């Protein structure tokens, strides 16, 4: 997991940073932290944004109102001077740091990071992640004198979920997390193989003073933009057959200056320019961050396993189904040229339509009594797409209907595979 209250650096790393970084005195107007060779990404009259190694820190030069999910100093504050995004471990196979994580509570982790940076823990808002800080995305949007800047890291490989998905964990009054599944059936993972690429961290800075409600509205807009990005990329939930809206450990920090000469903005509505800037900046930053961290980009979604994986389509299942429906010769050809099927744009278009129909049926937008006919119609289009022979749609539909009578209809994914096999066979039967 990459959530901040479990993320930690142990004593070995603390010694490493203590030896590497020299202490510096703090000056309120000139933020300092223990970087010996930082890269300054942005510096202006309001803040300095710097990165070194596994740390990204925004040091505020003037008082700011900060809204954050930080486990310590979280919520709304006017006493936070440092905004930190920290990589606490590698995304995969980091056994040592994974074990160190689960031994520290929220306060201990927060204090450890503050000590490494040589800054007061009470002046820091913190986000933790397993994403590579070097893959940090940065986007700024302007309108007249208004500026919105977003820094983001993002990973969704293992932890993507849709709001309301079933969960395994609950917490006691003392905050200890406990599985709500019986021990015999609770999922277990080896920390040697656990994939922790699952946190979206957003750090958003506005150059204008905001009333508290407007700042909270920005958090809403940022969440909406995040969900929109995952929908654009068709990122699947790992807990349900639906498109994800985020991950289980997403975090955010929003900062805006206070006590400025201009009156605070009273609203950050999506109907206002500030709302547009927030939404577009978050969207672009997350698209960039997901590309660099997970190599997820729009073209990545043109892949049958990506499109229908949330419904159970895998390479193994596809090959088994093709072998069932094709002759030995035709199957051998399909197996050797599988990429020409799974990456074909026309076939993926038909698959997207098929997945959307499955969603509509699950959401109750379409009558369940018509499900078989609805899926048969689109499955025939899948055969058309694979074969590139649209005039044979009626023939494809009838063949699929004959083998999928209501009392013996295939599962939706198996019907899709049968349609692919039929299309592949027809492609070469001139």
Language-model segment annotations:
Residues 23-430:
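Alpha/propeptide regions of enzymes that mature by internal proteolysis
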Residues 12-15:
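Hydrophobic alpha-helical segments of integral membrane proteins
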Residues 9-10, 21:
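Short stretches within intrinsically disordered, low-complexity N-terminal or propeptide regions
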Residues 17-19:
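N-terminal signal peptide c-region/cleavage motif recognized by signal peptidases
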Residues 1-9:
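Bacterial N-terminal signal peptides that target proteins for export
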């Amino acid at each position: 997991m990459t959530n901040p209250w479990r993320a930690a650096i142990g004593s070995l790393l603390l010694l490493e940073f203590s030896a590497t970084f020299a202490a510096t005195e703090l000056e309120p107007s000139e933020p300092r932290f223990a970087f010996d060779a930082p890269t300054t990404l942005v510096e202006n009259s309001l803040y300095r944004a710097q990165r070194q190694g596994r740390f990204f820190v925004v040091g505020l030069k003037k008082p700011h109102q900060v809204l954050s999910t930080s486990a310590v100093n979280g919520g709304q504050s006017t006493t936070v001077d440092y905004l930190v995004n920290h990589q606490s471990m590698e995304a995969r196979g980091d056994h040592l740091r994974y074990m160190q994580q689960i031994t520290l509570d929220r306060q201990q982790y927060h204090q450890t990071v503050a000590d490494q940076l040589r800054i007061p823990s009470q002046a820091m808002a913190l986000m933790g992640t397993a994403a590579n800080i070097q893959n940090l995305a940065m986007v700024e949007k302007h309108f007249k004198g208004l500026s919105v800047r977003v820094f983001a890291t993002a990973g969704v490989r293992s932890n993507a979920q849709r709001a309301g998905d079933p969960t395994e964990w609950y917490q006691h009054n003392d905050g200890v997390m406990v599985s709500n599944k019986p021990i015999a059936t609770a999922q277990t993972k080896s920390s040697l193989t656990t994939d922790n690429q699952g946190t979206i961290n957003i750090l958003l800075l506005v150059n204008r003073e905001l009333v508290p409600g407007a700042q909270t509205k920005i958090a809403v807009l940022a969440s909406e933009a995040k969900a929109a990005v995952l929908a654009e990329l068709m990122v699947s939930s790992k807990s349900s057959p639906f498109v994800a809206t985020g991950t289980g450990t997403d975090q955010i920090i929003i900062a805006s200056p206070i006590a400025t000469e201009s009156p605070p903005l009273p609203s950050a509505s999506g109907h206002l320019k500030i709302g547009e800037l927030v939404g577009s900046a978050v969207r672009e930053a997350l698209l960039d961050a997901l590309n660099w961290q997970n190599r997820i980009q729009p073209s990545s979604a043109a892949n049958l396993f990506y499109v229908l994986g949330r419904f159970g389509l895998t390479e193994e299942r596809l090959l088994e189904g093709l072998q069932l429906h094709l002759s030995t010769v035709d199957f051998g050809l399909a197996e050797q040229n599988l990429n020409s099927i799974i990456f074909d744009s026309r076939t993926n278009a038909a698959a997207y339509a098929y997945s959307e129909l499955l969603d509509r049926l699950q959401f109750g937008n379409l009558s369940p009594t018509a499900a078989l006919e609805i899926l048969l119609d689109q499955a025939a289009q899948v055969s058309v797409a694979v074969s590139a022979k649209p005039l044979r749609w009626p023939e494809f539909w009838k063949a699929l209907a004959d083998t999928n009578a209501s009392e013996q209809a295939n599962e939706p994914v198996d019907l899709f595979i049968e349609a692919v096999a039929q299309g592949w066979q027809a492609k070469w039967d001139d």
